[in-house]
């Protein structure tokens, strides 16, 4: 199932109705790219949520049963990548009419960093879209990459990073 901005916000509107208090959620990956209008839709829904709001979101999600996959990570973790503590401060606020959800997206450089960790062909395409749309510079990606934690083999991340930099920032 393909989810565009409207479907994502409809889903979050249903979650919003079930919440008993205000929470913060941060869209990652294709979800963030859809909300930032980099992509027209996403095939899955992914968030990283500060721990104090994680259970609230999960309870609401269980009640509404969205009918599509929703992956939720804790505190700046995104798949096998652990973003620095400032990921939330660097995130971008998405203006919505939601009452109990403060919706953010990862900063575009953090989207790129998390996609480098997995780096399949779709991730490469997403990285290219982010670099072009947000005019990301090689040094910004390198610097941010130095700050992250990686749950698999660090060498895999380093190799993926080098591959991305070589592909999208060829030496002049």
PLM ranges: what are they?
Residues 1-172:
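Compositionally biased terminal segments of proteins
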């Amino acid at each position: 199932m393909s989810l565009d901005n409207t479907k994502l916000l409809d889903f979050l509107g249903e979650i919003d109705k079930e919440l008993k208090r205000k929470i913060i959620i941060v869209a990652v990956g294709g979800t963030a790219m859809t909300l930032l209008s980099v992509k027209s839709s996403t095939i899955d829904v992914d968030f990283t949520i500060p721990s104090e709001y994680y259970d609230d979101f999960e309870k609401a999600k269980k009640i509404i049963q969205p009918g599509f996959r929703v992956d939720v990570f804790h505190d700046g973790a995104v798949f096998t990548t652990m973003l620095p503590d400032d990921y939330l401060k660097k995130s971008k606020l998405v203006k919505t009419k939601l009452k109990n959800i403060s919706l953010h997206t990862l900063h575009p450089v953090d989207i790129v960093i998390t996609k480098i960790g997995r780096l399949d062909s779709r991730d490469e395409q997403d990285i290219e879209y982010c670099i072009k749309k947000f005019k990301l510079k090689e040094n910004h990606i390198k610097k941010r990459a130095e700050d992250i934690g990686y749950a698999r083999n660090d060498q895999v991340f380093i190799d993926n990073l080098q591959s991305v930099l070589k592909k999208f920032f060829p030496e002049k």
